[in-house]
Amino acid sequence: MKSIMRSCLGLFVLLTVITGVLYPVFVTGLAKTFFPSKASGSIVYQGDQAIGSELIGQNFTDAKYFWGRPSATGPQPYNGTASGGSNQGPLNPALVDAVKGRIEALQNADSTNQLPIPMDLVTASASGLDPEISPQAAQYQASRVAKARKMSLDNVNQLIAANTQDRQWGIFGEPRVNVLKLNLALDGN
């Protein structure tokens, strides 16, 4: 009995060291060697200062910026420690009220816009941290951003097109626009 327990304990310690220490250190080392930016969280820098991540949305609220998807992370938008969906069903009165409020806010921000409001501007993603919107969501906001920045709508549309990523390998996912990168392109213009 003691020899069996000793063998089990030894195997437990060995596998803990292999899978809990050696393997993660090895994989992290490989990632930092071959994909240093990705392994560090895809941080976006402006000069020497980190201003965000390509992978986590930010709470842009100024009219001169494109707005991302609503965050489902509670009172602090885009809080990575509170990541998760709202878990509200489509008939949940709280979700219906939240969507109506978001629609009203978008209409108030650009009352002359007659385009249909894309779904991703009024509903949160599964993680609540999505950094990207659809090209349609960017197009919907283009007139508001152009007016706020006193830019031509054509220039704003060119920036949207330049920052639109196609499907991965032509088949996976949907075309998308990273909101942080698009807003940085606007600031650089």
Curated annotation (Swiss-Prot):
Transmembrane annotation, as ranges: 11-31
UniProt topology in membrane: Single-pass membrane protein
Location in or out of the cell: Cell inner membrane
Cellular component, GO annotation: plasma membrane
GO molecular function: ATP binding; P-type potassium transmembrane transporter activity
Record key words, sorted: ATP-binding, Cell inner membrane, Cell membrane, Ion transport, Membrane, Nucleotide-binding, Potassium, Potassium transport, Transmembrane, Transmembrane helix, Transport
Signal peptide: none
The UniProt record lists the keyword Acyltransferase: no
Subunit structure as annotated in this protein's UniProt entry: The system is composed of three essential subunits: KdpA, KdpB and KdpC.
Its biological purpose: Part of the high-affinity ATP-driven potassium transport (or Kdp) system, which catalyzes the hydrolysis of ATP coupled with the electrogenic transport of potassium into the cytoplasm. This subunit acts as a catalytic chaperone that increases the ATP-binding affinity of the ATP-hydrolyzing subunit KdpB by the formation of a transient KdpB/KdpC/ATP ternary complex.
UniProt-listed NCBIfam families: kdpC, PRK00315.1
The protein's name: Potassium-transporting ATPase KdpC subunit
